[in-house]
UniProtKB/Swiss-Prot annotation:
Protein species of origin: Listeria innocua serovar 6a (strain ATCC BAA-680 / CLIP 11262)
Catalysis performed (reactions): (S)-dihydroorotate + H2O = N-carbamoyl-L-aspartate + H(+)
Any one Gene Ontology molecular-function term assigned to this protein's record: dihydroorotase activity
Name the UniProt record assigns to this protein: Dihydroorotase
Sites where the protein binds substrate: 60-62, 92, 276, 307, 321-322
Domain of life assignment: Bacteria
Alphabetical GO biological process terms: 'de novo' UMP biosynthetic process; purine nucleobase catabolic process
Keywords, sorted A to Z: Hydrolase, Metal-binding, Pyrimidine biosynthesis, Zinc
The protein's required cofactors: Zn(2+)
Catalytic center residues: 303
EC number: 3.5.2.3
Amino acid sequence: MYVLKNGQVLNESGELENKDVLIQNGKVNLIADSIEVTSGEEFDATGKLIAPGFIDVHVHLREPGGEHKETILTGTKAAARGGYTTICSMPNTKPVPDSKEVMNSLQAKIKETAEVRVLPYASITTSLGTDELVDFEALKEAGAFAFTDDGVGVQLAGTMYEAMKRAAALDMAIVAHCEDNSLIYGGVVHDGIFAEKEGLKGIPNIAESVQIARDVLLAEAAGCHYHVCHISTKESVRVVRDAKRAGIRVTAEVSPHHLILDEEDIPGNDGNWKMNPPLRSKEDRAALLEGLLDGTIDFIATDHAPHAAEEKNVPMEQAAFGIVGLETAFPLLYTHFVKTNEWTLKQLIDWMTVKPAECFKLPYGKLEEGAVADIVVLDLEKEATIDPATFYSKGKNTPFVGETCIGWPVATFAEGELVYNEGENK
């Protein structure tokens, strides 16, 4: 049992109220002006925000098969440090969770080592990127969160349509990394100013938006919940907006780096600035911000993608795609958008908690009496510089190194257990 004393909580109007919070038996037992108990542990939250634990539906934990990049343990420790209490693990592992046996093995490993809640995706196709569909029913029984071939767009419309029909029959979501391979052209960055300046092959916007346009029509025909991963282009935002207006069951996420950065921020041919989708144009970034504010884009997800140093500290042509994000998402977004009065604090918290929960019907994301005690304590005055040497993640690959941010998680509770406390050893 914990009592969080003298903290602040956000009410429905977005105003801060001084409250104590009692955690008992893994639940939020009481939220009141003052709580006095004779047993349990007191946590001093004076002047700090007590918020629901963050939810990230797009995380690469790399285990099994990529433990040199990340493990379930290190990835969930990083999540806890970043304030995340629920993360959804992508299936680009070795082996791929494309069968009940592999999924059962993964679930056992999660139960054994995870510091926070991990909801694993199953793949759509066997081995990722094939045309053979997995056994959807068996994988749902084994606890799959949803189905995705993340990292690889499903290339054939017929394959995707059949997958959507099977997912719809089970009331499960299809989650899509949208990329038409015939339009990538071997690109490593956005097909724009930076690519031209550096003489690099570019990935055009249409590689993403064309597949989203195809898929929303398939989702309409199949009656499926279709979710777009890491949306990055103005055309994609337009397609999703039109689909929502047409009543199609489509949701979309955006990553912090696509909201904060664009291609003109890239300092040079540095593998730590290589991600997929790539940093796009200023016009694309503006469209993403507009889409998030008007509800076209539903929430924020990090696409945390750790790699070993030797896979990133090389030119872009040789580097792996992806950057880490779990430990820096909140401070970066708070600094860039809340402190600048572009967003309210409540908007940011909602996009990291209740919005993803609502999209995927998860019973998390709210701080209220009776709720699961997934909680992050945030020091909105704490200022610190992003230093990969301090990361709990094995991945140190971030373009934000050296940036000073304000507003950091200082404690995280997952199902009532203190899983991160600032200042304690890793």
